Amino acid sequence: MSNVCIIAWVYGRVQGVGFRYTTQHEAQRLGLTGYAKNMDDGSVEVVACGDAAQVEKLIKWLKEGGPRSARVDKILTEPHSPRETLTGFSIRY
């Protein structure tokens, strides 16, 4: 079981549709730490850390569109090394 952290930027209709809240719920269900945050360009930034297989499941869920009310057009991911210790999965403003 290896731990990884990723940062993802999710583009499409992802703000104002409950995207951060459902991402938080899914990440908590998978046992991940991190956060979801609305960005000024209309995207959502997601940082997720935990077991590599569980992080992959979250990425797959994000690529599949997240909540039904959202529409994901594009997702970019890369490895990430947070400068802070992340506990739980939060929504940032």
Curated annotation (Swiss-Prot):
Record-linked InterPro entries: Acylphosphatase, Acylphosphatase-like_dom, Acylphosphatase-like_dom_sf, Acylphosphatase_bac, Acylphosphatase_CS
Domain of life: Bacteria
SUPFAM superfamilies: Acylphosphatase/BLUF domain-like (SSF54975)
EC number: 3.6.1.7
Domain Acylphosphatase-like: 5-93
Family: Belongs to the acylphosphatase family.
HAMAP family with a match to the protein in the record: Acylphosphatase_entero
PANTHER family linked to this entry: ACYLPHOSPHATASE (PTHR47268:SF4)
Protein name, as recorded: Acylphosphatase
Gene name, Swiss-Prot/TrEMBL: yccX
